[in-house]
């Protein structure tokens, strides 16, 4: 039996929600280990749609323990809203089904204000932040001035933490022309929200290790995608946390030896939200067609996603940096009806061919894609549940992807419905 880490292997929006839900039915624990409420995931269960951005996907399944690890930055007000919305939809949530790391960092209103002010004043190169305060919260964590969940339990400690935080933020706000933070108003907000958050606070590292020793199946749920990783993504157009699989251990307090299988979620084409390099991007009718057929709009922001052909170079890189054991290929059905498909197999930069994306942003922007053409198919792949249900050209497309990324397909998803999945390798039994 293997504990499984699920990571996005592109720029996010790969369809992780469905795959995590599909796996969570057999997991005992589902844990978020990085990010905040900036990356949404959509679940379709028995025809009902759930849109989550902070809570783990397992929260909608009775009898599962959902965990928000220390690697996550937590907006407590958004947490309470998301819990209330799910309860209104009939989902039962209690401290027995949801656990939050007591050392998780809080996102405060001042973080969102700072995030948005910086983005609006940055006329040189916008990062494309969602403006929800995730980046500034991580800055405070690394700067050792953050307020954490456990701080809510002691008013004297909380007041000291706020004072220390204000020294930094008031200086930043003066430079940006923003009014100073109202310290007393912030303390009042934190005191009011504390009773709604503290019942879920636990030493997650301890519980996770106890679960592991008891032989419980653990599913680690990543948000966003490896190409947005703060170290290995297309910097500076990245998120503020590590997204790759190694963060699953750091972000929950469990040792790396607990990870048995890394499942990389990969869309059958490529999308990206916001700014940054995108070598295989299509700005023509094919790109529009992919966006329309794939309904490529962000779950959280509603922003239209940029679309392009499958980039094998980038996925090969992310499979390496996350140690991916196998991929789940999603949205194959979006490619139905294309006479010809293309896969990016390399880049050209200043007359040289590259087999990887260079690290320097200016070089990334100058890379042009080298495409390989494949025959498309006219038949529908939607709802296929076995290889025999797929057109021959679709099977060839999948096999070519495996060859190029040097990683096998473990799962193939052919629609948003959780059961429309072709299982090749069971991650939990690997």
UniProtKB/Swiss-Prot annotation:
GO BP: any one term: IMP metabolic process
GO cellular component, as recorded: cytoplasm
Superkingdom assignment: Bacteria
Pfam families: Adenylsucc_synt
Reactions accelerated catalytically: IMP + L-aspartate + GTP = N(6)-(1,2-dicarboxyethyl)-AMP + GDP + phosphate + 2 H(+)
Keyword entries, A-Z: Cytoplasm, GTP-binding, Ligase, Magnesium, Metal-binding, Nucleotide-binding, Purine biosynthesis
Name of protein: Adenylosuccinate synthetase
């Amino acid at each position: 039996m293997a504990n499984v880490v699920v990571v996005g292997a592109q720029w996010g929006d790969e369809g992780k929600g469905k795959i995590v839900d599909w796996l969570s039915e057999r997991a005992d624990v589902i844990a978020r280990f990085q990010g905040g409420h900036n990356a949404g995931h959509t679940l379709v269960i028995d025809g009902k749609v759930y849109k989550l951005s902070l809570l783990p996907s397992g929260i909608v399944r009775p009898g599962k323990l959902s965990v928000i690890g220390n690697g996550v930055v937590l907006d407590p007000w958004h947490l309470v809203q998301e819990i209330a919305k799910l309860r209104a939809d009939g989902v039962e949530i209690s401290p027995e089904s949801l656990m939050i790391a007591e050392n998780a960092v809080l996102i405060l209103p001042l973080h969102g204000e700072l995030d948005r002010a910086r983005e609006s004043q940055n006329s040189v190169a916008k990062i494309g932040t969602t403006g929800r305060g995730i980046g500034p919260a991580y800055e405070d964590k690394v700067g050792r001035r953050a307020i954490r969940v456990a701080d809510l339990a002691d008013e004297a400690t909380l007041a000291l933490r706020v004072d220390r935080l204000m020294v930094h933020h008031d200086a930043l706000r003066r430079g940006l022309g923003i009014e100073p933070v109202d310290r007393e108003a912030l303390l009042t907000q934190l005191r009011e929200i504390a009773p709604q958050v503290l019942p879920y606070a636990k030493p997650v590292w301890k519980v996770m290790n106890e679960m592991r020793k008891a032989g419980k199946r653990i599913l680690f749920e990543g948000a966003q995608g490896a190409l947005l990783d703060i170290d290995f993504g297309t910097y500076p157009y990245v998120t503020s946390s590590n997204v790759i699989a190694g963060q699953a251990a750091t972000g929950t307090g469990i040792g790396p030896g607990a990870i048995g299988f890394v499942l990389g979620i990969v869309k059958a084409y490529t999308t990206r939200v916001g700014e940054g390099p995108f070598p295989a991007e299509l700005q023509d009718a094919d790109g529009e067609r992919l966006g329309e057929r794939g309904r490529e709009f962000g779950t959280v922001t509603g922003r239209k996603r940029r679309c392009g052909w499958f980039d094998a170079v980038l996925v090969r890189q992310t499979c390496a940096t996350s140690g991916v054991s196998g991929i789940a290929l999603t949205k194959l059905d979006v490619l139905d009806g294309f006479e010809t498909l293309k896969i990016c197999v390399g880049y050209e930069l200043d007359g040289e061919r590259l087999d990887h994306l260079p690290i320097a942003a200016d070089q990334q922007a100058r890379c042009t894609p080298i495409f390989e053409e494949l025959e498309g198919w006219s038949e529908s792949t939607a709802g296929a549940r076995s290889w025999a249900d797929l057109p021959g050209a679709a099977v060839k497309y999948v096999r070519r992807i495996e060859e190029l990324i040097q990683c096998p397909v473990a799962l193939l998803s052919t629609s948003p419905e959780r059961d429309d999945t072709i299982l090749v390798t069971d991650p939990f039994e690997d």
